[in-house]
Amino acid sequence: MNKLYSLFLFLFIQLSIKYNNAKVTVDTVCKRGFLIQMSGHLECKCENDLVLVNEETCEEKVLKCDEKTVNKPCGDFSKCIKIDGNPVSYACKCNLGYDMVNNVCIPNECKNVTCGNGKCILDTSNPVKTGVCSCNIGKVPNVQDQNKCSKDGETKCSLKCLKENETCKAVDGIYKCDCKDGFIIDNESSICTAFSAYNILNLSIMFILFSVCFFIM
């Protein structure tokens, strides 16, 4: 009975790990961020200067860790902690399951994985946690080079770009939903609108006013 229970518990834990590591899908709604795709995974990217507190949620980060900011996010997957001692100190530390490498918190299993043109992610298809490479768009893992992102290859975009006048585009090594050619994002409505002569005129007027103000100052 104990062996059966132990086996059930082990399988439950492994399934839970796999489920938790595969939270981001094409249907994920990133809170205060947007969805991007690389060759082997999807992830949420934060808007402006926000940081990821988990795989789906972005929040404002604190600029300094002190007694008022304990447990507040100070970077992607990191938070301020209190370090007991004499005197007491405060520091920005990675969340459980992550390690700091080059000032970035990455999964523990990725500490010794080098990908080149891509990044290391957790392999959610493997019941044993391992780090694998997910490549920039235009590159794929090379089995002859320790699965690093050193081989040219295509990845089909799977993002659901459902807003009006937007489409999937490859930008700086990732797929993201962006405005179609001839359209520009309206910051107030977050909708892609036609970049017409009227828009150009408005920009020209703003540029002239800015130039006049600059020279007056």
Swiss-Prot record:
Residues 197-217 form a propeptide. Keywords: Cell membrane, Disulfide bond, EGF-like domain, Glycoprotein, GPI-anchor, Lipoprotein, Malaria, Membrane, Repeat, Signal. A lipid is attached at S196 (GPI-anchor amidated serine). Disulfide bonds join C65-C80, C74-C92, C94-C105, C110-C120, C115-C133, C135-C149, C157-C168, C161-C177, C179-C192. InterPro entries: EGF-like_dom (IPR000742), Pvs25/Psv28_EGF (IPR010423). The keyword Ion transport does not apply. Residues 1-16 form the signal peptide. Residues 30-59, 61-106, 106-150, 153-193 form the EGF-like domain. This is 25 kDa ookinete surface antigen. It comes from Plasmodium falciparum (isolate NF54).
